[in-house]
Amino acid sequence: MSEIKTVGVIGAGVMGGGIAQSLAQAGYEVTCTDIASEALDTARQDAAEGRFGLAGAVARGKLDSSEADAARARITWSDSFEEAAQSDLIIECVPEKLDVKLSVFRSLDEAAPEHSILASNTSGFPIAAMAGATRRPDQVVGWHWASPAFVMKFAEIVVTEGTSDSTRDQVMACAKKCGKNPVAVRDNPLEWGFVANRIYFAMLREASRVVDEGVATHAEVNDLMVDCFRWPVGPFAMVKGAGSGWK
């Protein structure tokens, strides 16, 4: 089995920047790219000084300063798609629009070396659709991260019928090296979401019904679920926090 040494991240938004930081801290050489220079600047700043950035990790005793400096040096923030595409593993982190993701996968298939694994951080679009946009469906996989990427141990590794065992195993090993607890799950093209989001959104629909029926307010639902199930936040607070990167 080949070893992943370099990782490209396509998209420097809330998730892409955090994923790049996590990978760099795990020892990977990372190239993170975005078409928007402002997104790259924000991601670079967040990785260095943000709430879950390297400076904060040093202050909390999670890293020493030399480890933080080394991680910072392992990230290249670039506006070059082609540069990021020359990696052993490329993780797509563009907005949740299927047509955009398919376009990215077509471009990656053209630009990336033959051995490269192509992964998507989609929250729920079928991985089979993205695999079908390439000539290497056996090397396509989902790697669904949770926000904030650096903190959360969650990792859904989503495999299709065509994903090879080698691809799955390499990405699982990468996730473990990043300190995650990866679980390989099956792609289900007939449903949106894999495991965590299918269950979460079913719960969120019921929470919304409770509010719509006047049983409780949004805030009351949040408080009750925290107190009853010892969740860190309630279902409505989760939506807001995850979308903002918990800033």
Where are these predicted regions, by residue range?
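Rossmann-fold dinucleotide-binding core
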Residues: 117-187, 194-197
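Long, compositionally biased
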Residues: 242-247
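Helix N-cap / loop-to-helix initiation motif
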Residues: 3, 36, 64, 164, ...
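Internal alpha-helical scaffold of NAD(P)-dependent oxidoreductase catalytic cores
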Residues: 26-28, 136, 157-188, 203-231
